[in-house]
């Protein structure tokens, strides 16, 4: 059983190509092209519907499924986008999507942010933060009886940028470099039922 990677993806480009690729994805996921365990949202339906193959040396990765497709919206004058969410085994399948876009929406760009907790896999290609501004993920839980609970001002799962992370940790531990602050946070005494994890998102 794989660990599932959650990916948020944005396709951006000219209105006609954005609307067309969204329409095609909806069309490809309206039926099953082959037997699978995921239903119509299976990524393999997108691969096969687009005229590609999966499996083997040259096949496209498609183990997973689309969970949601957003509406087309305007980003800037003449520039449109829609967002899509999918799960895949262990890591994102951005290469599969890139190949499909090159064929059906060559003027479109793809931005994504992928996270797989068990493998400590957190990446994004959105270096300019057009859609995904977070730089860190806080994964924590402290019991009410923990002495640090009152000071720990983070949600159990929180997306945050480095500047805000440093400011909030400095309020708890005092002024020091971000790496030292993160080390302090990770070393908070916890029970077997508690945890403090800070994941830094890697830019690719």
How would you name each of these model-derived features?
Residues 1-204:
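Intrinsic low-complexity, intrinsically disordered or marginally ordered coil/linker segments
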